[in-house]
A protein has these predicted regions:
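A contiguous loop/helix-start segment that scaffolds small-molecule binding in enzyme catalytic cores
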Residues: 62, 66-115
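Class I SAM-dependent methyltransferase SAM-binding "motif I" and its flanking Rossmann-like core
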Residues: 2-59
Length: 115
């Protein structure tokens, strides 16, 4: 709740790096941290990805996925179908010079990625 309030106030939130990118991204995302599910990387095949996302959509709490930068636009498009209203945070290059955070619905992230 503190991170969400800081983000709403326009403050920049930076994670403290540790041994786990998952925790660093989660703690600075502004999404609820009281319950989360880590799904790792999704399968490469379209049907398997759709099935996995359908299963994940039923889970409560925050979902954390890893994805290759080469497939991120595909993932955002798939999220727009499977979880169209779910808040999404895309965190990349954490703790590096070009760290980037995108926040919004899957459709909003898709628009941000097209810029």
């Amino acid at each position: 709740r503190v991170v969400a309030a800081a983000l709403a106030a326009g403050c920049r939130v930076e994670p403290v790096p540790g041994a786990c990118a998952l925790v660093a991204a989660l703690t600075a995302s502004g999404l609820p941290t009281d319950e989360f599910h880590f799904a790792g990387f999704l399968p490469h095949k379209s049907g398997q990805r759709a099935n996995r996302l359908a299963g994940l959509a039923a889970l409560p709490g925050t979902l954390v996925l890893y994805e290759s930068p080469f497939r991120i636009e595909r993932l955002v498009a798939e999220l727009a179908v499977a979880l169209p209203e779910r808040p999404v945070v895309l965190a990349r290059e954490l703790t590096k010079k070009f760290e980037e955070w995108l926040r919004g619905t899957p459709a909003e992230l898709a628009a941000q990625l097209q810029v």
